[in-house]
Amino acid sequence: MNKKSVCLVATSALLSISVGHADQQAGLRQQIVGVWSLVSQSVEKPDGSRVERFGADPKGIAFFDQSGRFAMILMRSDLPKITSNNAMTATDAENKAIMQGSTAFFGSWSADEATGTMLNRIDSATYPNWDGTDQKRTVSMSGDEMKVCVPSQIGGTSCAVWRRSH
């Protein structure tokens, strides 16, 4: 092979790698776009123990739209009913159980195929300390399931498994 041929082959290879990379990036984004139902959520702590903040049968929904907006709601399936039937007069114990057993947040999102991550820029959350923050999450896809992991506030890694809603 002469120099010109080697140059053409190398250039073609580099172009196909960068085109392939662009397709992969669009691929992860396209795979994430949609409506998702929560299957499980747990925190694996540094000592290996697991915590299921939202219980063994969590409820949740996540929306990721094409324009880069998202919303997520996660909760326990056994949240207590408010005895007074009035959210404004719930007891301290009821409020605590509801706050500790649920979370919701929304904002904008982007995906990075090269790192297998999603960046969530949180506009507002039921946990106000998240307002205006960025959270980088690892994402892995398997068929109609998406596993999303992020460092946990209690130490370790928090992972949620979502199933595409049809």
Spans of model-derived segments:
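Bacterial N-terminal signal peptides
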Residues: 8-17
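Lipid interaction determinants
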Residues: 20-166
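Bacterial N-terminal signal peptides that target proteins for export
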Residues: 1-8
